[in-house]
Amino acid sequence: MTDVYQHIECRWCHGQSPATSTSCDRCGAPLDIRDSVTEGGWRQAPQIRDLTEIQSGSSVYQLDGTVVPIAEVNLGEGERVFFEHHVMLWKDEHTAMSVMDMPGGAKRILAGMPFVLSVATGPGRVAFSRDAPGEIVMLPIDPGVRLHVREHAMIVASANLGYSFEKVQGLKAMLAAGTGMYLDSFTAGDQPGLLVLHGYGNVFERTLAEGETVQVEPGGFLYKDAAVTFDISTQKLDTGGGQGLQAAKGLASRGFAGLKAARSLMKGGDGLAGVLSSGGLQTAAAALTGPGITLMRLTGPGRVGIQSMYMEHGAA
């Protein structure tokens, strides 16, 4: 039997495993993960079983928990990981700790980003948690690959990954994209690295072909390959409300009492009752008078990762 039949390639991380394996030896993902996709092309991030050992260098990573999961790292001698200090849950007493200065400190402070990162050096164990419901995913990054990630989504990363940030271009994109002023950027050099992210809700991924686009709710964006570009588009809404819509606008201008009447008027007709009942005066007025909804338009080629629970910039 030739070598090609003795191994199977993981479609998630492209690692090679024996043909009889049911999960990837490198990242722990089920080897048939690409067989389970929606008609829209999305697949759920690999459901790595609790306490599955994932090797990166001489360190071992494990995930545990469901509602608020944790990532535990058993660091090899001299191996390091970096992270934001507030996500560390516990560590062995002898695990060495230090800090790593980040370039552009003043800009990062103004943008609400950390200007120093914590570093743990092995040997020893250290565990991390976002202290929020969601899902933790492990993303192997191959040499030469660069990944853009939503601010504050990183849980921990192997120290052989280059970490920087890239400014979101354009005022409209910065204000509307929901990602803040910057995107985190992670790059693998000569050696592969491992990036651990937290997504609110569940995490899904789709691979876009060259020139293929998808429009995403800005709060749902989590990560993308660097080759994937994005801009902001406004989708105009046709309410079909006619005179009823104009009457609702007039009622909404009268304050909360008017909003209640507007809600009754619009209920079942224009789909805005839920907004009126939960969004408050400002949101309701914007919904009634605004030109449309803002979406993040991503264009391939490359991977796009989303989280199913929308989070505004700055939420943690």
Where do the language-model regions lie?
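Composition-driven recognition of glycine/serine/threonine/acidic- and proline-rich low-complexity segments
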Residues: 3, 7, 11-21, 25-316
